[in-house]
């Protein structure tokens, strides 16, 4: 049975882009068109290794009313590893409810019968080991490589691109909220550097890719217009979802900064945290 996802504690706004001011009004809203929810993970459900206050209980309520998928641009963890981490914090989440950019990247490579040169962490690179028998190496795959972002490896990636390989960005986020609760640089800057040097545009696998959002919606047998995206990233979560046809709710936790409200990207709804959803 459908139930309202919104109450007076959540502000709504008309979807307007490139406006000089963010304007929101308080309202009580019942939206019967919403049949499913996509929910970002880091910054929305938890920060560091601590759940957002009220997130566990709120998530249980949402899951009792809607089909839910948890979508994340993490380039360091598989769906199984994400679920293990969330369960250790007290969240009740199944592996088939999680869609990660890393898992979709592996599916992409398999479908294109290719392995990659990986600018990833050692653990993330090991996730692709079963593709090593594929002779064709047609892609440079870039995610958050941390200490593996060396000049030597970046230059090798550049030379492969110059030799004909294509560039894949597992994700292209600017920054993320780190375990010390400060913003840290994400993979996007390194992807942009390789794009600039090689003259090639990266194919983005994760959010804000339309294909990623459509894959998540189709896994619940709903159309994008019937789905709400909850996130803390004004570009990947909000703008990306809007352009894919979803409704959006921005939470002021995680990587959210006040300047996001001046970006001209207008979420359909805004809340202080996921706990404000009744």
Model-derived segments and spans:
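Conserved phosphoryl-transfer catalytic core
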Residues: 66
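Methionine residue identity
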Residues: 1-2
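Asp-based, Mg2+/Mn2+-dependent phosphohydrolase catalytic module
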Residues: 5-6, 15-39, 44-61, 76, ...
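Conserved phosphate-coupling serine/threonine residues in phosphotransfer and NTP-handling enzymes
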Residues: 72
